[in-house]
Every structure is written in C-alpha cells, then in structure tokens.
Amino acid sequence: MKIKVISTPVQNQEKALAFYTKTLGFVKKIDIPLSENNRWLTVVAKEEQDGPEILLEPSPNHFKPSKVYQKALKEAGIPYTQFNVNNLQNEYERLLKLGVVFSIEPTHMGTVKIAVFNDTCGNLIQLVEEL
C-alpha cells in the first residue's frame, strides 16, 4: 500500500491552482472537468512528479461538513497538512517575498523546525525541516 493522492479542501480551484503552482512551486499533474464547478485537479512536487498528488478538492463549496471542518481547523490555528522542506529559513524568506502570510514564523520544536502559513484557499499549511 502507498499514498497516491491526498485531498486538500479549497474554496476556489482556480485560485488554489495559481497559489500552489506559482507561489509554492508545485506542478499541475491532472486537470479533468467533472461538472460546471468541479474538476479532478491535482498538483505534485516539481522534484517528484511521479510522487504523491495533492487533489485540490472544492468540497467546502458543496459539502457543508467539509466547510465546517476546514473553518474549525483554521480558526483553531491547526494546519490542514504539512510539507517538508530542506531549508525552512530559505523557503520562509522566499514565500514572504511572494506575499505569503505566516501565522507562525520559523520555530524550533525538538527535532524539527516549523512554520505555518495561510494558503489563501481556506487552510493553514505547516512547513517542516527535519534537523
């Protein structure tokens, strides 16, 4: 068993695609229209294009429990997911220059450094550098 696709709820797929590709640096992998306001839209890490895909899932728009869950996590300051990086400080500075808003600046936590940012699509995302 292995991870192929992980779903991340987003409020607007087009906005999410722009943020996840142009700002974060992911690459669009699959884009299949399913209905008027819904696509099977995935992105992958540029360095690992055959690796796990992130499905930019518009569920908060048509499935109330997803919207409630997404909102509750964000209001509690809990990241929806995390991405690993090789150098957290460099990534933090790069994203700051692109206008990304961080709720937690780079912070040591035991064997890792973390930072948390707003993905502009309804989620907090945690960056992690393993030390």
Language-model features, listed with the residues they occupy:
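Conserved catalytic-loop position in the HRD/HxD motif
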Residues: N87
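Conserved beta-strand-loop-alpha-helix junction that forms the acyl-donor binding cleft
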Residues: V10-Q13
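Vicinal oxygen chelate
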Residues: M1-V5, V27-F83, Y92-N118, E129-L131
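Conserved active-site tyrosine of GNAT-family acetyltransferases
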Residues: A16-T21, L95, G122
